[in-house]
């Protein structure tokens, strides 16, 4: 091949290359018609999106109206039907917001790893959330959430009704804002902060159990750190036992059944401790037997399935990822069931308290949750997920860090293990914070491994190609130039980020301000409503 080099005059110099470079065709200048067509296309897209948004809002309003109609039909059962009607509207609004915000953590990783389509995730999450709420959601809830407020502050029935109504509305408004901003937050923390704010407005600062609030503040750090560390550890185990092995398929046949059995064991204990805690509270020995039994059953069922599925797979990472598909779908379903069993009752607790006081006329520390109240919570969450959940599901699944099925499996398994470990240690944790902490932990582990790998490659840099070496040899200061190029490569490798910092900062900020913001909002609503009520 003839030698040649490129000069600044737009010609190639050398034997056989002494000719002008071909001229690039100039881009056609946009005409007024092109600009008008682009404007019309943008207008059409905006019109379609507006129509879709209007349809979603219309369906949500129909659900709220259906709740109103039901409460109106049961009006004879309440001392103050108007208050229960308002509470039903706010409770339905709250349930819609929980579905739009809080459920994304359960199915987002599976969608991001392409183990589930968005439609499939919505169907599975909706069914499992509803089943968890109605089957294992429990029938009793504390009137004043989690011992945050001294019950004496709500000794008057009117004060309790007003406080719970303001707490419910404040938490719902905050969840709505967080969803609009694209920040997944803890429903339980929103309710706790709102109840605390109502308690302060009703009985002063002394009414709040500040040590309990301190534990909740500690969970802002404990939950994501624990979730992230455990998820990163699980992913490292998967990498070193399967993905880094010369024969990945053989390693996967050995280790995937074990990992799935660990997941089944963890979720069995998780569901008993978290989802069924109001129905049954087993001791450590019973939990251990449940975990061992689930491990054995799962391994016996999964091992032959994985062996059959591995037949014909080539020794590529992408092929091995297929073996994690079914376990990942099952984990998303189990997480949704456990969330429905635990968090739905917490969300409708204030509504149940209002209904209980309106029915009996007295204040009780615990009230029974009527079936229709639990149904409002379950149906509202499912509908909110279907109508408004896809945005946050995409954020959790695709916009924070890139996920494959092994990473998503590590996140799901971490959520169950972290909750169990925290419960045994008596640490306050949030399932929402754990799931997102696990997601960030996996992303930061990817960054660390990527930088470590790239620094190793740069240190073992191969000789430059001959054409580049010849050019550098003719340049003044060739050694310095080569050092500069390699230093620039190191700098770029260090700067490469696999976790989007903008999402990290916005989500962390939303976590920190959820409790104080809902408290301030609830206190303001309570003060305003109290003044209007008295007037």
Report each predicted region and the residues it spans.
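Alpha-helical transmembrane segments and immediately membrane-proximal extracytoplasmic
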Residues: 2-535
């Amino acid at each position: 091949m003839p030698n040649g080099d490129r000069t600044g005059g737009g010609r190639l110099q050398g034997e056989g290359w002494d000719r002008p470079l071909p001229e690039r065709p100039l881009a056609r200048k946009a005409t007024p018609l092109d600009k008008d067509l682009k404007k019309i296309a943008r207008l059409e897209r905006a019109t379609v999106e507006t129509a879709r948004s209007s349809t979603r809002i219309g369906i949500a309003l129909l659900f709220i109206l259906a709740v109103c109609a039901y409460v109106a039909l049961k009006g004879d059962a309440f001392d103050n039907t108007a208050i229960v009607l308002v509470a039903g509207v706010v409770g339905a609004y709250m349930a819609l917001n929980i579905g739009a915000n809080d459920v994304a953590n359960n199915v987002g990783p599976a969608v991001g790893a392409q183990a589930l389509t968005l439609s499939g995730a919505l169907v599975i999450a909706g069914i499992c959330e509803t089943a968890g709420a109605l089957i294992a959601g429990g029938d009793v809830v504390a009137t004043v959430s989690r011992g945050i407020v001294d019950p004496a502050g709500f000794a008057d029935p009117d004060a309790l009704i007003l406080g719970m109504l303001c707490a419910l509305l404040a938490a719902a408004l905050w969840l709505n804002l967080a969803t609009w901003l694209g920040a997944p937050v803890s429903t339980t923390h929103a309710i706790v902060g709102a109840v605390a704010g109502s308690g302060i407005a009703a009985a002063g600062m002394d009414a709040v159990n500040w040590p309990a609030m301190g534990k909740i503040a500690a969970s802002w750090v404990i939950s994501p750190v624990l979730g992230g560390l455990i998820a990163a550890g699980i992913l490292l185990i998967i990498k070193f036992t399967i993905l880094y092995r010369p024969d990945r398929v053989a390693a996967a046949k050995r280790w995937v059944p074990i990992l799935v059995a660990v997941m089944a064991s963890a979720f069995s204990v998780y569901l008993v401790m978290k989802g069924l805690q109001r129905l049954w509270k087993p001791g450590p020995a019973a939990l251990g037997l449940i975990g061992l039994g689930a491990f054995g059953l799962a391994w016996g069922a999964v091992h032959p399935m994985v062996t059959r599925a591995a037949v014909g797979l080539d020794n590529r990472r992408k092929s091995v990822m297929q073996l994690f598909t079914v376990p990942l779908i099952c984990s998303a379903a189990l997480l949704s069931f456990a969330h429905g069993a635990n968090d739905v009752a917490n969300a409708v607790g204030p509504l149940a308290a209002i209904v209980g006081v309106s029915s009996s006329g007295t204040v009780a520390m615990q009230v029974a949750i009527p079936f229709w109240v639990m149904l409002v919570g379950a149906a509202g969450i499912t509908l909110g997920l279907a109508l408004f959940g896809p945005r946050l599901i995409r954020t959790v699944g695709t916009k924070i860090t890139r996920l494959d099925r092994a990473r998503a499996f590590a996140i799901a398994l971490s959520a169950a293990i972290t909750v169990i470990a925290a419960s045994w240690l008596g640490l306050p944790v949030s399932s929402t914070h754990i799931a997102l902490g696990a997601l960030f932990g996996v992303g930061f582990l990817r960054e660390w491994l990527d930088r470590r790998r790239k620094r190793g490659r740069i240190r073992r840099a191969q000789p430059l190609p001959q054409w580049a070496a010849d050019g550098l040899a003719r340049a003044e200061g060739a050694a310095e130039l080569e050092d500069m190029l390699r230093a620039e490569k190191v700098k770029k490798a260090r700067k490469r980020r696999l976790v989007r910092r903008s999402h990290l900062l916005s989500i962390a900020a939303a976590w920190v301000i959820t409790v104080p913001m809902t408290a301030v909002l609830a206190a303001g609503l309570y003060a305003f409503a109290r003044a209007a009520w008295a007037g």
